[in-house]
From Swiss-Prot:
Miscellaneous comment text of the record: According to PubMed:19808072, a longer form of this peptide exists.
GO CC annotations on file: extracellular region
Domain of life: Eukaryota
Keywords annotated in UniProt: Amidation, Neuropeptide, Secreted
Matching Pfam families: Periviscerokin
Biological role stated in the UniProt entry: Mediates visceral muscle contractile activity (myotropic activity).
Chief place where the protein resides: secreted
Places the protein is found: Secreted
Name listed for the protein in its UniProt record: Periviscerokinin-2
Length: 11
């Protein structure tokens, strides 16, 4: 849940 990280905001 590292919201903000692209392109995987769910990582």
């Amino acid at each position: 849940g590292a919201s903000g990280l692209i392109p995987f905001p769910r990582l």
